[in-house]
Each structure stands twice: as C-alpha cells, then as structure tokens.
C-alpha cells in the first residue's frame, strides 16, 4: 500500500503506484463526497478501482471518532447500495489514540493500559464501521483485536 494520496497531491502518488505495482491509499478528510471525488480522480489518472483503498481519516475515540464512524458507515452503505465509486476496501489508522490527553495525563502506571484500551476500542469500532484494514501500534492492541475478531 502506497500512501497517502490526497486531493492536492494524488497525481505523484498515483504515478508511483502505477510504476511499481502498488495499491494507493486515498485519504480524504472525513467526508463521503471528498472520498468519492478522490477515487474518481485516481481512476482518471489510470489507477484501477481494485488498486484503491479508501482512508476517510479516523480521529481518536472521543476526539471526533463518532463523526469518522458515521462517514465510514455511509461509505460502506453507499458501496453496498451499488455506488461503484465507493466500493473499495477501507483502511483506518487510529494511532492518534496513543497520544491523546487522557493517556498523557493518566497516572504513569496506568498510561500503558489506558493507551491500549483507547487504541483497541477505536480500532474495533473502525472494523464495525466497515474498515477492512486497521493499523495499530501497540502489540497488546494487536493481541486483543486478533482475539475478538477470531471469535
């Protein structure tokens, strides 16, 4: 996956992806219409739709994630309703959760557990909203996600 292609710099990312056989992460700022528009622009530059992965950007849980969730859900529902411009897999990288104020200001011995909890719940919610790929940083988050997703 090569990324991120954004509205102001998608051509160079698309060219590199095409030249080297990579998929493109199309990142738009938490907006269904902007995600759709970027996918169209990428396809017009020659990137096949099966080589595009949508990243609608994910805020941390409690920091706008509710809106991110809503946008991800609407993208997935539009795709399921037949909108080919949004029928691509989604990626979510809620890694901001490790540095939010609640984690930074927690008692030192609780910071690690709190960081894992915030990252886990945000990542799990992203899966529920329709993300196919979720990027996390903490190894304990990976363990917990594997456990609940394999259940």
Q: Residue ranges of each PLM-predicted region?
A:
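A glycine-rich helix N-cap at a beta->alpha junction
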Residues: 1-2
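Catalytic alpha/beta core domains of metabolic enzymes, predominantly
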Residues: 5-148
């Amino acid at each position: 996956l090569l990324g991120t292609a954004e509205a102001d710099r998608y051509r160079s990312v698309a060219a590199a992806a095409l030249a080297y056989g990579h998929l493109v992460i199309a990142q738009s700022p938490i907006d269904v219409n902007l995600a759709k528009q970027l996918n169209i622009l990428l396809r017009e530059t020659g990137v096949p739709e099966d080589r595009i992965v949508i990243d609608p950007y994910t805020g941390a849980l409690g920091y706008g994630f509710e809106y991110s969730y809503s946008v991800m859900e609407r993208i997935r529902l539009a795709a399921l309703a037949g909108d080919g411009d949004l029928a691509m897999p989604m990626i979510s990288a809620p890694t901001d959760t490790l540095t939010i104020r609640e984690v930074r200001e927690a008692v030192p011995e609780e910071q690690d557990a709190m960081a894992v909890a915030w990252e886990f719940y945000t990542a799990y919610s992203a899966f529920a909203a329709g993300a196919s790929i979720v990027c996390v940083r903490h190894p304990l988050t990976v363990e917990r996600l594997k456990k609940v997703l394999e259940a």
